[in-house]
Amino acid sequence: MKVLGIESSCDDCCAAIVENGNTILSNIKLSQKEHKKYYGIVPEIASRLHTEFIMYVCQQAIISAKINISEIDLIAVTSQPGLIGSLIVGVNFAKGLSIALKKPLICIDHILGHLYAPLLNHTIEYPFLSLVLSGGHTILAKQNNFDDIEILGRTLDDACGEAFDKIAKHYKMGFPGGPNIEKLAIDGNQYAFNFPITIFDKKENRYDFSYSGLKTACIHQLEKFKNNNAQITNNNIAASFQRAAFENLIIPIKRAIKDTNIKKLIISGGVASNLYLREKIKNLEIETYYPPIDLCTDNAAMIAGIGYLMYLKYGASSIETNANSRIENYKYTKGVKL
């Protein structure tokens, strides 16, 4: 079964053809450079550019896969969560294509896509722990199957990737923040500043994360956390912030490993491409799986892949399904199964 995946939840306009859930025939992405001068995503600009790009990326996905449009068996599209204007463009385009081609439509949750991304290039037996690190989400979960996912912990405020972007914006390190901070950190002293990390000891929050305190310390309290003789440079700020941001993740992950006795972890989302993070995770001495670097960030291959499995089990989505910008369960509710 050949699935056309469409992803437009934020600023990347993506389309892919994936066969039988894991064979990537094409994977096309257009990133919007127009946001760089604002040091962040401008939703109105993002949605407008999606309307210009979406037909092109779908055409290129079909051409690159060397198939005819009539060979598409299923259309999978991200319908939630994300920027509502961007989502509407993708969902409405997918609906129109579904009607025109008389092919079924399956609407996919963006987070389920990220959780599936490592399975595009790895065969991993369930259960395993999953960590999604992106600009919009920081989620620790237990996966019993592709559609049986229990949220253990989540950020109580900023997402990990969001904190990177905000620090980079404040110190004019460039956008997107994650890759630029990683590059600057290479030539910095990671111990120049002892920025705080937040660990929750209450039972109901033992797997949760928080980045607001670290962000505040890094932006407003540099002198307070500066070590003696350390210089205040962007390289040192980046290195020290990056170290604290990832140390923030380690204790909740260790607790989840101990409590579940699961020693397999997948990490996905844009932040998963960070090589410093990967070195830190190695110290956990467990099986760890990542998507390829180009599948860590938003992409349509992960949407097509999970779309194939969801369609086989649950059938097509209603053509009346609408885009949904927020899913409160991700932010506020733990123990919920997706």
From Swiss-Prot:
> What does this protein's record comment on cofactor binding?
Binds 1 Fe(2+) ion per subunit.
Question: Which E.C. number(s) belong to this protein?
Answer: 2.3.1.234
Needed co-factor(s): Fe(2+)
Catalytic activity line of the entry:
L-threonylcarbamoyladenylate + adenosine(37) in tRNA = N(6)-L-threonylcarbamoyladenosine(37) in tRNA + AMP + H(+)
- Positions binding Fe cation in this chain are H110, H114, D298
Q: Which InterPro entries match?
A: ATPase_NBD, Gcp-like_dom, KAE1/TsaD, Peptidase_M22_CS, TsaD
* Principal subcellular localisation of the protein: cytoplasm
GO MF assignments: iron ion binding; N(6)-L-threonylcarbamoyladenine synthase activity
- Biological processes, Gene Ontology terms: tRNA threonylcarbamoyladenosine modification
- The residues the record assigns to binding substrate are V132, L133, S134, G135, G136, D165, G178, N274
Q: Which CDD domains match?
A: ASKHA_NBD_TsaD_bac
Keywords, comma-separated and alphabetical: Acyltransferase, Cytoplasm, Iron, Metal-binding, Transferase, tRNA processing
Can you say where in the cell this protein is located? Cytoplasm
Pfam families, from UniProt?
A: TsaD
Any keyword Glycosyltransferase? no
Instruction: Look up keyword Metal-binding and say if it applies.
Output: yes
Superkingdom to which the source organism belongs: Bacteria
Gene Ontology annotations for the cellular component aspect, listed alphabetically:
cytoplasm
Q: What does this protein do?
A: Required for the formation of a threonylcarbamoyl group on adenosine at position 37 (t(6)A37) in tRNAs that read codons beginning with adenine. Is involved in the transfer of the threonylcarbamoyl moiety of threonylcarbamoyl-AMP (TC-AMP) to the N6 group of A37, together with TsaE and TsaB. TsaD likely plays a direct catalytic role in this reaction.
Identify this protein by name. Answer: tRNA N6-adenosine threonylcarbamoyltransferase
